[in-house]
């Protein structure tokens, strides 16, 4: 589960490498985010010449989580790292490529562009 102050790897080519969670969106008093949830982050590490710079406040969607997510059939999916994709206000990704697998739960939350760009959907 992703909470405030959690650091995540960025799984796109927007220019950010690592972000720190500021807030979990979706209701007052919400503490944790899971796969498919939108969070507000600040960029902690960035590559030179990228779209986003260090210190920028951005929105991102969680695409991989160490704690995993429970599916309707009772199975769980877990990943080796916490990762996110930086998005615009209309839920489209700011980068043009997605690195690594993403969870199928993104399709349920209408992040179809991220699902189509991903090399593998688990």
Swiss-Prot record:
GO terms for biological process: translation. GO terms for molecular function: large ribosomal subunit rRNA binding; structural constituent of ribosome. It holds the Pfam family Ribosomal_L14. Keywords: Ribonucleoprotein, Ribosomal protein, RNA-binding, rRNA-binding. InterPro entries: Ribosomal_uL14 (IPR000218), Ribosomal_uL14_bac-type (IPR005745), Ribosomal_uL14_CS (IPR019972), Ribosomal_uL14_sf (IPR036853). GO terms for cellular component: cytosolic large ribosomal subunit. NCBIfam families: rplN_bact. Belongs to the universal ribosomal protein uL14 family. Binds to 23S rRNA. Forms part of two intersubunit bridges in the 70S ribosome. Part of the 50S ribosomal subunit. Forms a cluster with proteins L3 and L19. In the 70S ribosome, L14 and L19 interact and together make contacts with the 16S rRNA in bridges B5 and B8. PANTHER family: 50S/60S RIBOSOMAL PROTEIN L14/L23, LARGE RIBOSOMAL SUBUNIT PROTEIN UL14M. This is Large ribosomal subunit protein uL14. It comes from Bacillus licheniformis (strain ATCC 14580 / DSM 13 / JCM 2505 / CCUG 7422 / NBRC 12200 / NCIMB 9375 / NCTC 10341 / NRRL NRS-1264 / Gibson 46). The lineage of its organism: Bacteria, Bacillati, Bacillota, Bacilli, Bacillales.
């Amino acid at each position: 589960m992703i909470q405030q102050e959690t650091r995540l790897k960025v799984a796109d080519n927007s220019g950010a490498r690592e972000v720190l969670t500021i807030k979990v969106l979706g209701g007052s008093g919400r503490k944790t985010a899971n796969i498919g949830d939108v969070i507000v982050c600040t960029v902690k590490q960035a590559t030179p010449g990228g779209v986003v710079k260090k210190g920028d406040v951005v929105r991102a969607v969680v695409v991989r989580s160490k704690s995993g997510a429970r599916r309707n059939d009772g199975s769980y999916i877990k990943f080796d790292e916490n990762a996110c994709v930086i998005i615009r206000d209309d839920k489209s990704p700011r980068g043009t490529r997605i690195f690594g697998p993403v969870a199928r739960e993104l399709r349920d939350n209408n992040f179809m562009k991220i699902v189509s760009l991903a090399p593998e959907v688990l």
